[in-house]
């Protein structure tokens, strides 16, 4: 029987990419999250064992760690606000102790890249001290300290994406001239996977980055070039951290507490000083920054997006995610799925091919249409019909990927009308389904 792998922080970004790779490699996977039902929208949900547990409640850890060979520690507490450093260290120590008792053979931890001997932000210091807390136990720990991670859905990349798309002139403090060594998210996953099979990395700390060193402002300018946008960076002598985190929280998908911690972490260089990882894991072939951006942009489609919003917590949501503005609605319909889907196809026919073309169709379940309207961005509308415990549910999701400032203005200025139209649309589909 394949060894059991535990992935903590399963609702997070890295875990969402790591778990499919583990499953594809034939591993048995168990996920650990405080609220496992938030994972229901993930494609792999039914192929893994899901255990509710919280490192801040040590008594919950034993069931999650029982029978585990290797555990990935992908937990952070940035969203919890002040005092997160103490919580992260306490949680890591509790996990290390519980892993030792459970007989876990290996812990793999993903942290952040900074010089621990230099002047670094509380966020980066917390990442380093979390690794030290995990090593407090007797279970061997492999720690990867990553520079800026580039990939669709990465917090760092989404900050770059949304701010560069929105602002013709991007303001930034002096540290925007600091150096980083951005690494493609697929290479991060490559390293995390390689640590499972390559015993030479056990018990070591590795700094990981991509093949290029670039200033933070250059990352935005290169993104703009690949998107065909004309952008400038304006270096400002001083911008208060609270003001920057407020702006990032407003303009991007990154919540303000996380933005506050993350921006503080950008105030220093993030480059690899010790490249032993290249010798220990030569099987990992590094991807260039431009290629990483192009891969991320190629995923700008509803067919590739991670459905983090599809859970049991609310049936109407608007959010920013992976380059999209998203309007999500879900209602219960008193009709069979086939009848609901028949009404959906009639509505789609009414729109006509001049307005929309069919992107994806799964009979009686899913219809995804791509907009052909001339707008400053790309749009899709998707309907899904599902049968859950003798009840039929209809979900309607609108995706809009803005291109440049005009795309943002288009979405926000039409907000009042958009809300009315999308509400009317799903309600009419439901109403017509019941009289079909």
Stretches with model-predicted labels:
Residues 290, 294, 408-436:
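A conserved amphipathic terminal alpha-helix motif
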Residues 91, 155-156, 175-196, 204:
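Substrate-positioning beta->alpha
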Residues 111, 132-162, 166, 171:
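Conserved beta-loop-beta element that borders a ligand/cofactor-binding pocket
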Residues 2-27:
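N-terminal Rossmann NAD(P)H-binding glycine-rich loop of SDR-like oxidoreductase domains
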Residues 326, 332-380:
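Glycine-rich portal/gate segments that line the openings of hydrophobic small-molecule binding cavities
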Residues 4, 195-261, 269-329:
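Mid/C-terminal beta-alpha module of Rossmann-like enzyme folds, strongest
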Residues 37-102, 112-119:
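NAD(P)H-binding glycine-rich loop region in Rossmannoid oxidoreductase-like domains
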Residues 373-419:
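Beta-strand/loop substructures that line and gate deep hydrophobic ligand-binding cavities in soluble
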């Amino acid at each position: 029987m394949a060894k059991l792998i535990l992935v903590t922080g399963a609702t997070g970004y890295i875990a969402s990419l790591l778990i499919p790779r583990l499953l594809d490699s034939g591993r048995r996977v168990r996920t650990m999250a405080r609220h496992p039902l938030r994972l229901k929208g993930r494609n792999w949900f039914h192929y893994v064992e899901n255990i509710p547990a919280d490192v801040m409640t040590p008594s919950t850890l034993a069931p999650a760690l029982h029978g585990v060979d290797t555990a990935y520690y992908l937990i952070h507490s940035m969203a919890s606000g002040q005092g997160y450093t103490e919580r992260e260290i306490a949680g890591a120590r509790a996990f290390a102790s519980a892993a030792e008792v459970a007989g876990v053979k290996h812990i793999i931890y993903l942290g952040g890249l900074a010089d621990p001997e230099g002047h670094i932000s509380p966020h980066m210091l917390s990442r380093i001290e979390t690794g030290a807390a995990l090593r407090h136990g007797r279970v061997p720990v492999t720690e990867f300290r990553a520079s800026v991670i580039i990939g669709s859905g990465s917090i760092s990349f989404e900050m770059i994406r949304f701010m560069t798309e929105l602002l013709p002139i991007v303001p930034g403090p002096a540290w925007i001239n600091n150096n980083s060594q951005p690494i493609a998210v697929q290479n991060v996953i490559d390293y995390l996977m390689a640590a499972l099979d390559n015993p030479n990395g056990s018990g070591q700390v590795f700094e990981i980055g991509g093949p290029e060193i670039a200033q933070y402002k250059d990352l935005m300018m290169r993104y703009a070039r690949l998107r065909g946008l004309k952008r400038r960076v304006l270096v400002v002598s001083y911008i208060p951290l609270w003001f920057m985190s407020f702006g990032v929280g407003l303009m991007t998908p990154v919540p303000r507490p996380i933005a506050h911690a993350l921006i503080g972490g950008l105030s220093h260089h993030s480059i690899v000083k010790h490249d032993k990882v290249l010798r220990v894991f030569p099987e990992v072939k590094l991807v260039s920054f431009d290629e990483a951006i192009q891969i991320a942009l190629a995923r700008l489609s509803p067919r590739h997006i991670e459905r983090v919003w599809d859970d049991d917590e609310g049936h109407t949501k608007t959010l920013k995610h992976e380059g999209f503005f998203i309007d999500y609605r879900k209602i219960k319909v008193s009709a069979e799925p086939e009848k609901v889907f028949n009404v959906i196809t009639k509505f789609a026919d009414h729109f006509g091919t001049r307005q929309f073309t069919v992107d994806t169709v799964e009979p009686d379940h899913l219809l995804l249409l791509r907009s052909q309207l001339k707008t400053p961005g790309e749009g899709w509308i998707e309907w899904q019909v599902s049968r859950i415990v003798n009840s039929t549910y209809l979900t309607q999701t609108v995706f809009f990927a803005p291109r440049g400032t005009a795309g943002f203005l288009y979405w926000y200025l039409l907000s009042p009308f958009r809300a009315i139209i999308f509400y009317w649309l799903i309600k009419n589909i439901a109403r017509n389904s019941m009289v079909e």
